[in-house]
Amino acid sequence: MQDRDMKVQLLLTGNEIMSGDTVDSNSALIARRLGELGLGVFRKVTVGDEVALLRRELAAMTEDADLVIVNGGLGPTVDDLTAEILAAVAGVGIERHPQAVTHLEAWCAGRNLPLNDANLKQAMLPAGATVVDNPIGSAVGFEMNVGNCRVICTPGVPGELAAMLDGIIADLAARLERPPERRVLRLQTFGLGESSAQQMISDALPDWPAEVELGFRAGAPQMEIKLTIDRASAEPALRRCRERLQALFGDHIIGEGDTLLAERVLQLLRDRGETLVTAESCTGGLIASMLTRIPGSSEAFHAGFVTYSNAVKRAVLGVSDETLTEHGAVSEPVVQQMAEGAMARADADYAIAVSGIAGPDGGTPDKPVGTVWIAWGARGALHTRRLLWPVERSLFQTMIAAAGLDMIRRTLLGIDTEPRYFSQRRAR
């Protein structure tokens, strides 16, 4: 296979993508993994489950590209057409592949399922195709050459695709005539916006080196700053840029690579042999969910209390009637008592407690929609802050959950300076 200048195209299939019922995240993942090899996607096409259209598009791609990755259409149903389409474009027949059958037998046996005709459809592959292992799902991938183009077919289920890409990328790397020089460094941040980050860089680092490409990817709750170089000789410049960004953004940087805020918090807690508990009202358990998505979270996360009503705040966490009556559920004394009660009941070292008004209703002149009180810290050393985050309900919950985690991260790291979003989101 030729070097990193090869032309790569993606073909995504499925009516569910065309209709908007499914959001395409797979192409971004594929492009990102290919970028590790210095390979860029120069064209992406999405086509519904139409045989003629799929056949025409794949045929055109194989004439124009060195590598085509097809995503979707590998399952057991009648609208899974990829094997049929590739066989037609390659001018070969369809045959039952023994390795695919063996995979299906093991997959069904492990789940106590019968190996029926619908499942066996997934073993019908283009003649001459090579199986690409799927370590999670029932549908194997497959690949073959069509003329001078290599075609790799992958399943549309995101988790299965992600699991398969490790092997696919390793195989592609072995086939390249020269090792990739492209390097991508990703810095994960919280509390910074794209425009403010760009302005800070422009003001503080006007001599940014041309050989280091700077990019941003906004998300909720994190923002990614991406640095890219295309040749190994630019590695010193990349290191200098990383050091300068770390000095500029400092405590807003969570970590490198794909580090998640919850992952960083758990790592810090594990390193210290300490534990965390959450007490949530307006976020409805989202902080606990973010934490428990991380494997091994039970080593540091003791419990999560979702105390949505005042009655449950009283009964479960011991928030007093007097405090609720005098100050209301969205108040500093209430989140303090929520945090204290949670730590006492879970025997944890640290707590995060949140109570706010997610909207769209429930606001008052004194406490408008978007108002939230956060408490965080250790026993006898709790901190509190009132913020105003007037955004759509689900985004409010995401950002408040992340803010709570961020404050615990800062506490564990001994960071005393306030984050930028404290001044930007200060409630008046």
Label every PLM stretch briefly.
Residues 5-45, 236:
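Glycine-rich phosphate/diphosphate-binding loop of Rossmann-like nucleotide-binding domains
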Residues 8-10, 151, 276:
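Conserved hydrophobic helix-helix packing surfaces used for dimerization/oligomerization
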Residues 13-15, 70-78, 155-156, 230-231, ...:
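Glycine-rich beta-strand-to-loop/alpha-helix junction loops that act as flexible
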Residues 31, 35-60, 96-137, 312-349:
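Glycine-rich oxoanion-binding loops at beta->alpha junctions
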Residues 53-56, 63, 80-176:
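Proline/glycine-rich low-complexity loops and linkers
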Residues 143-144, 216-218, 372-378:
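Short beta-strand elements
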Residues 145-221, 228-230, 236-240:
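Accessory alpha-helical/coil subdomains and C-terminal extensions
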Residues 235-428:
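Short alpha-helical segments enriched in small residues
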